[in-house]
Curated annotation (Swiss-Prot):
Subunit structure: Component of the eukaryotic translation initiation factor 3 (eIF-3) complex. The eIF-3 complex interacts with pix.
Molecular function, one GO term: translation initiation factor activity
Protein name in UniProt: Eukaryotic translation initiation factor 3 subunit G-1
Gene Ontology biological process terms, A to Z: formation of cytoplasmic translation initiation complex
Species, as recorded: Drosophila persimilis (Fruit fly)
Domain of life: Eukaryota
Compartment(s) where it occurs, according to its Swiss-Prot or TrEMBL record: Cytoplasm
SMART domains xrefs: RRM
Family from the record: Belongs to the eIF-3 subunit G family.
UniProt keyword Cytoplasm present: yes
One Pfam family linked to the record: eIF3g
SUPFAM superfamilies reported in the protein's UniProt record: RNA-binding domain, RBD
Record-level GO cellular component terms: eukaryotic 43S preinitiation complex; eukaryotic 48S preinitiation complex; eukaryotic translation initiation factor 3 complex
C-alpha cells in the first residue's frame, strides 16, 4: 500500500507563519548611516514597509554615562541591542532646568525692581504718575497746591530769624529794607534753569506772577540766534516770595522740562 506523501511548505510560508504574517525587522549600516526596515499593517489592514534612516555620530560622554550603557538589560528588553527600543522605551518631552544663585534670588525679591510697582507719584493729585503728566495740571487743584506751598514757604521765611541761627549782616539789612554796603540787593533773587529755547519774557512773567511781585527779571538769550540759553534770573521785592518760588517751581514740569530753581549766587566785586 503506497504511503501518504507529505507536502512540505516553503520556507517563506514558515517565516510568515512565525512572525504573524510580517517579516522581521532588519538593520543595515552603510556609510555612517543605519537603515532600519520594519513591516506593519496600516489602518486598511494592508501590509506596509517602513524604512527609517539614522545618521551615526560620535560624541564624548562622561565615564558614568558610558559605563551605564554597558549594563545588562533585563525583562522584555533582555535581548535588545544597546540604546533605546521604540517598542519598550518611550522618550518624554525635554525639560530644561535653570539654576539660580542667591544673588539672583535677592534681585528678584527686590521691591524696587518690581515692574508692576509704580514709583512715580504726582504732587498735585497724589496719583501714580509724574506731576508734569497730571491731568489736573493748571486746574483749581494745582492752584490750591501752589497757594499752600507759597503760604508754607512764607511762614518759614518769616520764622527763620526766630530760630536762633546765625544770620549774615547782608540778610539782616535786606529784611530791614536797606541795601547795606553792597549797593545792590540780590537776597531776593532766584535763578531758574533748564528752560526751553522757546521761552520768552512774557512766559517768564506768567510763570512767576502768581507767587509775588517782582522788581526785575532777566532772560538770558543767545546773541546770534536770539533763543533762550536755558536760564533766567528773577528779583522779587520780598525774600519770602523768592523762597516760595523756589519751593513751588523747583522740580516743577514746564514745557516738557523739569525746572531747577535755586538762590542766585551773589556777584563778587
Amino acid at each position: 500500500m503506497p504511503g501518504v506523501e507529505t507536502i512540505k511548505s516553503s520556507w517563506a510560508d514558515e517565516v510568515e507563519l512565525d512572525y504573524g504574517g510580517l517579516p522581521p525587522t532588519t538593520e543595515n549600516v552603510e556609510n555612517g548611516h543605519k537603515y532600519v526596515t520594519e513591516y506593519k499593517y496600516n489602518k486598511d489592514d494592508k501590509k506596509t514597509k517602513v524604512v527609517r534612516t539614522y545618521k551615526i555620530s560620535k560624541q564624548v560622554v562622561p565615564k558614568t554615562v558610558a559605563k551605564r550603557r554597558t549594563w545588562t538589560k533585563f525583562g522584555e528588553s533582555k535581548s535588545d541591542k544597546p540604546g533605546p527600543n521604540s517598542h519598550t522605551t518611550m522618550v518624554s518631552e525635554e525639560i530644561i532646568m535653570q539654576f539660580l544663585n542667591s544673588k539672583e534670588d535677592e534681585k528678584a525679591n527686590d521691591p524696587l525692581l518690581d515692574p508692576t510697582k509704580n514709583i512715580a507719584k504726582c504732587r498735585i493729585c497724589n496719583g501714580e504718575h509724574w506731576s508734569v503728566n497730571c491731568p489736573y495740571k493748571g486746574t483749581a487743584m494745582d492752584t490750591n497746591l501752589m497757594e499752600k506751598k507759597a503760604a508754607a514757604a512764607a511762614s518759614a521765611a518769616v520764622d527763620a530769624p526766630k530760630s536762633g541761627k546765625y544770620v549774615p549782616p547782608f540778610l539782616k539789612d535786606s529784611q530791614k529794607g536797606g541795601l547795606g554796603m553792597r549797593g545792590r540787593d540780590d537776597t531776593a533773587a532766584i535763578r531758574i534753569s533748564n528752560l526751553s529755547e522757546s521761552m520768552t519774557e512774557a512766559d517768564l512773567e506768567e510763570l512767576v506772577k502768581k507767587i509775588g511781585p517782582q522788581s526785575k527779571m532777566y532772560l538770558a538769550r543767545d546773541k546770534n540766534t536770539g533763543l533762550c540759553k536755558g536760564f533766567a534770573y528773577v528779583h522779587f521785592k520780598q525774600r519770602k516770595d523768592a523762597a516760595a518760588a523756589i519751593e513751588i517751581l523747583n522740580g516743577h514740569g514746564y514745557d516738557h522740562l523739569i525746572l531747577s530753581v535755586e538762590w542766585s549766587k551773589p556777584q563778587n566785586n
